[in-house]
Amino acid sequence: MINIIQIKDLDAPELQIYYNLNEAQLFHYFEPKPGIFIAESPKVIERALDAGCVPMSFLMEKKHVETQAKEILARCEKLQSRDLTQKSLVYREDEHVIPVYVAEIEVLAKITGYQLTRGMLCAMYRPALSSVEQLCKNARRVAILENVVNPTNVGAIFRSAAALGMDAVLLTTGCSNPLYRRAIRVSMGTVFQVPWTYLGEETKPETVRNPDSEEEKEPGTGIERNLEPEEKADSGNWQKQLHELGFHTVAMALKEDSLSIDDPKLMNEDKLAIVLGTEGDGLAPETIAACDDTVCIPMAHGVDSLNVAAASAVAFWQLGRQAHKDNCCNMNSNYQLWE
């Protein structure tokens, strides 16, 4: 059931999740259970619903209730009639009600970055992540991100992964979380269309910016990660796991013996895992050494590297098209991500 609640200011405690909590606080909101994330704009919210994500509440301009939010709210009414007690609403006592907070734009405009939300925000429960084995069971092309710390890059990589046919994305625990606000926004909601999980631990501690900092920051970007993570990815363990699942692993790195990305050997691999490294330093030497092959993108004008998000798009297109050549233009984008 939907409950429309008119608000005249942002002082209510239940609204702090939209403008006053950083990503770490949202992530740990129901600790030790999974927390929440914020989806922005009708398109992104629809993609999250398509993936089975469950709303906790909405915040939107009053005029949108009968316009661009109408179909979304109708979906949520139907959602309530199903057995949601098996999903994330077990966190709430009032589990049969989804509050929809509405206000005039003059009130909502006080939220930094509100103009980017297209007039609608939704707090949703973080779903439990699947195991690597579950995600890779029928996959032929997967992307592996090692310590990619910038949520903008993570979001852009997911958008390319969705568009260019990756079957799953696996992240080391040093990566920025795909459900951070900026990552979701940059991905245009495709983080809900590509199955993903962590290699190893599913959760990890976050480093939060000093709350007294005078630096202006956008909601959802209050996380400051070390650009050189203290914890190194245990590449030996996940490499072994991927090999047991039948994957040939390729490290995207520039070495004297690197294969060109269009090498026929790579195109003919049945199951391929494409490993991309952190901004700046790229992949750890031990990760490169543990991969079956090292692959590079031929470049001109003496350029020796691309931004990790740009490199991922090239790699996904070249190395993914053979596996998906029969259906690359007809991929189903509405499958369920989490059970």
Regions found by a protein language model. Name each.
Residues 120-122, 160-164, 178-191, 285-339:
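Structured adenosyl-cofactor binding patch, chiefly the S-adenosyl-L-methionine
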Residues 2, 43, 50, 81-87, ...:
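RNA substrate-binding interface of SAM-dependent RNA methyltransferases
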Residues 250-301:
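Active-site/ligand-binding-proximal alpha/beta "capping" segment
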Residues 7, 37, 146-147, 172-173, ...:
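Glycine- and other small-residue-rich loops at beta-strand/loop junctions that grip anionic moieties
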Residues 78-83, 93-109:
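A glycine-rich helix N-cap at a beta->alpha junction
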Residues 1-66:
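Boundary-proximal intrinsically disordered activation/regulatory segments immediately upstream
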Residues 68-93, 287:
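Short, aromatic/basic amphipathic alpha-helical patches
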